[in-house]
Amino acid sequence: MTSKIARNLGKSYEKKMYQHLGGMPSTIVLRFSNDTFDEVTKKRYHKKLNQFDGLVLPLDASDETSDTDLQYISASNILRNYANSNRNKEQRVYQELKEYNFWRNLYGTKGIALVVYLLIIVREITLHGTIDIKNIFLNPYPDYVVLILMTLYAVTFVLFVNKQTVIIKAFDYAKSLIEVCERI
């Protein structure tokens, strides 16, 4: 049940991220304005994808229109379906997807986690009454272990679980997904 909640919170953030970025990362990296792939590689991928019925990807930046993103979304869906049905051959894509989903869902639960950590920290401080800073460092066991751990977890969450990490993982997945063009 908690994994479903985490996923729903992560998916909720994902929609906001797509709006902020101007589309899905797999769509963005196919655009000529994006430099994830060099222009020669991008043209080669577009030609390869144009072999699929109904796809007409531009072969030059000047050919991109406002409707081109629909073609890029369709191309991404083709690659995603291929990668999902060939997980044994496309293990890197699957690994990048799992990492992206992990960080997206973790970021989605960040608020809840920080509230829980804060409640535990307040509980520990309340139980001890007065906090002896000297004992926290010199004699932390057993009195201050939970307080120290929860504080470290909260700080770690604040520092490392952030939007930028999720965006980086999203583009890592998008890049590996589009690179499937090399193997189809």
Predicted features and spans:
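Alpha-helical transmembrane spans of integral membrane proteins, capturing the lipid-embedded, hydrophobic core
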Residues: 1-4, 117, 151
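Alpha-helical transmembrane segments of polytopic integral membrane proteins
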Residues: 2-3, 122, 174
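Transmembrane alpha-helical segments and their cytosolic interface motifs
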Residues: 80-132, 140-141, 146
